[in-house]
Structures are given as structure tokens and as C-alpha cells.
């Protein structure tokens, strides 16, 4: 490989990193209220055990109403700073690693066949998600703890954490470094499943479905991204629930003995339905995720003239 080709690849890697991160930061900030409601719904059983929630939420609308009443509108952005700090490098690394891995595989649909090309897209998406998680997991943990740190209806109700740094300080004091990485194994499995489907299906279906008049259409790209996001998030949601429930036990006396123990106890005590609590919010949350992947395409096209290949 020549020096010029190396410089070109490095330049494209930097473009992917920047565009992916900017797109994600904008979309996640706009979807922060939905993100928080989803996490509150998902973790409400652990919150009941810890005393930070008085009674179960009756649904998404009830969660919105009670949160606004007890904590104020601004509270819907609680944990958003950690989410942006986490999501910027996560999405940026996801997109950048994905394109880098795809270029290393160099699968061509015409030359290698659709099946091999499709498998390459799934692998590059999943591997990118797994690699990115290594760098940002503690921020995801902190975001989850802040978002699920609710203030109940009682006037004496107090929050457990006073901010991002306080989450790190208290967790390290009670659980050590391990506390920041509780739930890491199901997180890796979940992110590989989600990212593999998210990127793999999008990259595979986009050149097949978005042709002719639909090629370059932001609306068509957005709708395709939304449908794929819904499928990917639903498929990986039980793993997401397990990892977040494990996160919630850091600093607590009673903990789960691993991901399988957590999964077994949730199903036994609460029913399999509990693995999908908050999943309905993903219908709305998916709008933000779909916006990221379609906005990413548009930003590259507008700013750098880089078209999908």
C-alpha cells in the first residue's frame, strides 16, 4: 500500500469518526427524555428494592407524568451529559471501525456473491460495536445510574448521586473498579447482536432498496434506518435489560451471580415480560437512532461528497 493510499484511508477514518460522533450527539440530546423514561421503566424493579421508587409505573405515559411532577421537566435530561460523553465516541468509533473492518475484508457483492458480502456487513457491524464498548463502558454505567436515580413522591426523598463524578466516586468506594464494569459480558453480547443487525442490515439493504428515485433520499434512508433499528433493538433488548439490572446492583448488598443468574431470577420472580419493560419506548427512541444513521450519510455527502458504495 502506497503512502498516498495510507493517508487517504486515515483521512476517511477521521471523517467517519467526526461525522458519526456529531450526528449521534445531536440525535441523543433530542431524544434524552425518551431515553430516561425507557431506563426508568426498564429498571423499576431494582429501584423498588432500593427504595428510590414508591410504586411501579403503569406505562410510558404514567412514567412521563410522574417524573415531570416529582422531578420537573429538566430532570428528563438527567444523565444526558454522561450519555453525550459516552455516545459521541461510541457512535464515532462504531462508524469508523465498521468502515475500517469492511475495507479490510474487501468483500464485493458482484465478485464474492450476496451471501458473503452480507455476512461481511454483519461481522463488521458487530465487531465495531464490541470494540467500541471497551472504551466507553464506565460512562454507560454512569449514565444508567444517573437516569435511574429517581426522586419519589415523598418530600424527604433524596437522590443517591449528585452528578457524574459522584457516581464514579461512590461506586469505586463501595465496589472498586469492578463496580464500573458490572454487566459487561451481556453488554458485549448485546452490542454485537444489536450493532451487527443495525449496521449489517442497513448496509446490505440500502443499495438494494434505495435505488432510482429513492437513491439519496433522506426520508427513505431515515425510514429504512428506523425499521432496522426497531428490529435490532427488540432482538437485543433482553440482554440490555440483564446488563442494566446488573449495573443497578453496584453499591448494593445483594448482587446477581452473573448474567445467567440475573436472567433466571428476572424470569422466575417477574416473568419473561419484565425482560421487555420499556421496550415500547424504543418505538420513539428509534427515531433518534434512525436519524443518526441517515444524518451520517447526508453529512458525508454534503460536506465531503462521499457517497455510499
From Swiss-Prot:
The name under which this protein is listed is: ADP,ATP carrier protein 1
Annotated catalysed reactions: ADP(in) + ATP(out) = ADP(out) + ATP(in)
The entry marks the following residues as binding ADP, namely 86, 98, 243
Q: Where is this region: Important for transport activity?
A: 243-248
Tell me where the Solcar repeats sit in this chain.
11-104, 116-208, 216-302
In the UniProt record, which is one GO cellular component term? Answer: cytosol
Principal location listed in the UniProt entry: mitochondrion
Reported function: ADP:ATP antiporter that mediates import of ADP into the mitochondrial matrix for ATP synthesis, and export of ATP out to fuel the cell. Cycles between the cytoplasmic-open state (c-state) and the matrix-open state (m-state): operates by the alternating access mechanism with a single substrate-binding site intermittently exposed to either the cytosolic (c-state) or matrix (m-state) side of the inner mitochondrial membrane.
**Alphabetically, which GO biological process terms does the record hold?**
aerobic respiration; heme biosynthetic process; heme transport; mitochondrial ADP transmembrane transport; mitochondrial ATP transmembrane transport; mitochondrial transport
GO terms, molecular function: ATP:ADP antiporter activity
Q: Where in the cell is it found?
A: Mitochondrion inner membrane
Q: Which gene encodes it?
A: AAC1
Regulation of activity is described as: The matrix-open state (m-state) is inhibited by the membrane-permeable bongkrekic acid (BKA). The cytoplasmic-open state (c-state) is inhibited by the membrane-impermeable toxic inhibitor carboxyatractyloside (CATR).
Amino acid at each position: 500500500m502506497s503512502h498516498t493510499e495510507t493517508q487517504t484511508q486515515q483521512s476517511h477514518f477521521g471523517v467517519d469518526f467526526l461525522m458519526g460522533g456529531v450526528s449521534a450527539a445531536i440525535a441523543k440530546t433530542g431524544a434524552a427524555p425518551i431515553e430516561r423514561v425507557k431506563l426508568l421503566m426498564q429498571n423499576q424493579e431494582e429501584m423498588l428494592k432500593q427504595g428510590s421508587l414508591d410504586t411501579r409505573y403503569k406505562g410510558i405515559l404514567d412514567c412521563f407524568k410522574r417524573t415531570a411532577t416529582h422531578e420537573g421537566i429538566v430532570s428528563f435530561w438527567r444523565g444526558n451529559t454522561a450519555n453525550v460523553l459516552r455516545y459521541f465516541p461510541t457512535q464515532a468509533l462504531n462508524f469508523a471501525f465498521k468502515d475500517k473492518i469492511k475495507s479490510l475484508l474487501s468483500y464485493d457483492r458482484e465478485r464474492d456473491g450476496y451471501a458473503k458480502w452480507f455476512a461481511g456487513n454483519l461481522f463488521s457491524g458487530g465487531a465495531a460495536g464490541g470494540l467500541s464498548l471497551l472504551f466507553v463502558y464506565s460512562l454507560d454505567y454512569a449514565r444508567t445510574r444517573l437516569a435511574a436515580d429517581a426522586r419519589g413522591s415523598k418530600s424527604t426523598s433524596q437522590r443517591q448521586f449528585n452528578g457524574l463524578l459522584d457516581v464514579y466516586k461512590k461506586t469505586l468506594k463501595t465496589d472498586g473498579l469492578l463496580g464500573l464494569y458490572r454487566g459487561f459480558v451481556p453488554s458485549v453480547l448485546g452490542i454485537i447482536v444489536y450493532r451487527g443487525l443495525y449496521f449489517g442490515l442497513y448496509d446490505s439493504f440500502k443499495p438494494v432498496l434505495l435505488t432510482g428515485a429513492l437513491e439519496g433520499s433522506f426520508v427513505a434512508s431515515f425510514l429504512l434506518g428506523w425499521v432496522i433499528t426497531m428490529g435490532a433493538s427488540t432482538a437485543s433488548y433482553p440482554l440490555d435489560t440483564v446488563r442494566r439490572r446488573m449495573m443497578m446492583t453496584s453499591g448494593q448488598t445483594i448482587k446477581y451471580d452473573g448474567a445467567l443468574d440475573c436472567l433466571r431470577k428476572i424470569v422466575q420472580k417477574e416473568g419473561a415480560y419484565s425482560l421487555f419493560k420499556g421496550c415500547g419506548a424504543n418505538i420513539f427512541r428509534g427515531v433518534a437512532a434512525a436519524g443518526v444513521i441517515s444524518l451520517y450519510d447526508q453529512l458525508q455527502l454534503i460536506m465531503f461528497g462521499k457517497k455510499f458504495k
